[in-house]
């Protein structure tokens, strides 16, 4: 009988704002990246592989927590993005990541753009260090 491989999960799955609040405390010791997903579409499982590889890199060890929560639980604490016509862009099937540093919103990234995500994460590390010293 073949054994099933256990899936190693990188993302901490949350359902409510109350579960998220401790991660957004000004004293939280890591950068926090939130996948704010639309409940109909769900989390982006494809991104999990990239996140796992990213977190395994020594430079990133113990510096970041990846969270996943339905967008409506964070809609009031993240800025609304607008298109060229000034219309609010709703969260849909494309992943949307929000980075927080010491409880403050830092930046959002649309889609699975790993180079852009890495760039913004490294900027958030610098901001974290700047506010720690």
Description of each model-found segment:
Residues 31-32, 95:
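Alpha/beta-hydrolase fold active-site loops
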Residues 90-133:
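Non-catalytic, surface beta->alpha helical segment in thiol-disulfide oxidoreductase systems
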Residues 80-93:
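A short glycine-leucine-enriched loop at secondary-structure breakpoints
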Residues 1-31, 62, 116-133:
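N-terminal leader/targeting and pre-domain segments
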Residues 43, 49, 95-98:
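Proline-centered helix-kink/hinge sites
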Residues 13-16, 36-38, 45-51, 55, ...:
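Thiol-based oxidoreductase modules, predominantly thioredoxin-like and allied folds used
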Residues 31, 41-42:
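Structural hallmark of WD40 beta-propellers
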Residues 33-37, 99:
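Structural cue for short, hydrophobic secondary-structure segments
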